[in-house]
Amino acid sequence: MNTLLEISSLTPDDIESIFNITMQYFNNRSQNNKILNGKVVVNLFFESSTRTLSSFEIAEKSLGAHSITLNINTSSINKGESIIDTILNINAMNPDLIIIRSQYSQLVKTISQYVSNCCIINAGDGNHEHPTQALIDYCTIRYLKKNISNLNISICGDILHSRVARSNIRLLSRYGANISLIAPPTLACDLVGVSHIYHNLIDGIRDADVIMLLRLQKERITNCVIPSEEEYSHLYMLNSERLSYAKKDVIIMHPGPTNKGTEISNNVAENKSVILLQVKMGVAVRKAILHYLLYGNKCNTSNEI
């Protein structure tokens, strides 16, 4: 395995290996591991990012890699160079791994056809997929609940435009989770792997073991999709009162960025969610992905995991 473009590219053995390596890093049993010493990793983010970019950079540097993040605003793309030509030039410099985020669906898969002798990671492409975030959520749920099979997982928010929802549905349904979607009719879509679609928040969370909230993707939403953010929050914001209808041990998740007061209240986000645990898990998962793509289950013998 030398690319991570979408969830379907992962075998069960890949996922299990990534989980096991993640747990080693998460529990700090490999904090001095410099397995990527001498490797060059290039981050190409054509779309804004806080958590994904920062956690990849931290993972890369923690593992000893030479980490380079191209500033798109000062790159030759602003002089008319195409994205493909940019990739071809970066590839000619012989990096070991390129991590790409783009606002265009399927662009990363297209780019991978032009790249040789280099690993590629999709860090999110349009509304297509965000496989590393799905792996973070999978590892977080498995860490807290031990098993995915037969869990009731409700995903609430802007499903229509969400690459996180698509990747999570594809991954979690493979392991026997019962996936429900909660959204206004204009932001819902029927995806393979989904058991139920609800348009009422309370109905959708009553039996949930996990509630995964998503922001409104205002950069992709047209004005006619929802009347207003205020109307959306009135019907779909998860607050303490609405949360009381869910199971007492329900896990509240959010991939970020959160828009508090819209899809989640301040109290629920800050006191009842595992959002920051997901962020912490994100560094460990991305370390594990870098490790696995470049070395598989093998370890640098001087820095055993």
Swiss-Prot record:
GO terms for biological process: 'de novo' pyrimidine nucleobase biosynthetic process; 'de novo' UMP biosynthetic process; amino acid metabolic process. Pathway: Pyrimidine metabolism; UMP biosynthesis via de novo pathway; (S)-dihydroorotate from bicarbonate: step 2/3. Pfam families: OTCace, OTCace_N. Keywords: Pyrimidine biosynthesis, Transferase. The keyword Transferase applies. GO terms for cellular component: cytosol. Coiled coil: none annotated. InterPro entries: Asp/Orn_carbamoyltranf_P-bd, Asp/Orn_carbamoylTrfase, Asp/Orn_carbamoylTrfase_sf, Asp_carbamoyltransf, Asp_carbamoyltransf_Asp/Orn-bd. L-aspartate binds at K79, R163, R215. PROSITE patterns: CARBAMOYLTRANSFERASE. Its EC number is 2.1.3.2. GO terms for molecular function: amino acid binding; aspartate carbamoyltransferase activity. Signal peptide: none annotated. The keyword Transferase applies. It catalyses: carbamoyl phosphate + L-aspartate = N-carbamoyl-L-aspartate + phosphate + H(+). Carbamoyl phosphate binds at R51, T52, R101, H130, Q133, G256, P257. Heterododecamer (2C3:3R2) of six catalytic PyrB chains organized as two trimers (C3), and six regulatory PyrI chains organized as three dimers (R2). Belongs to the aspartate/ornithine carbamoyltransferase superfamily. ATCase family. Catalyzes the condensation of carbamoyl phosphate and aspartate to form carbamoyl aspartate and inorganic phosphate, the committed step in the de novo pyrimidine nucleotide biosynthesis pathway. This is Aspartate carbamoyltransferase catalytic subunit. It comes from Ehrlichia canis (strain Jake). The gene is pyrB.
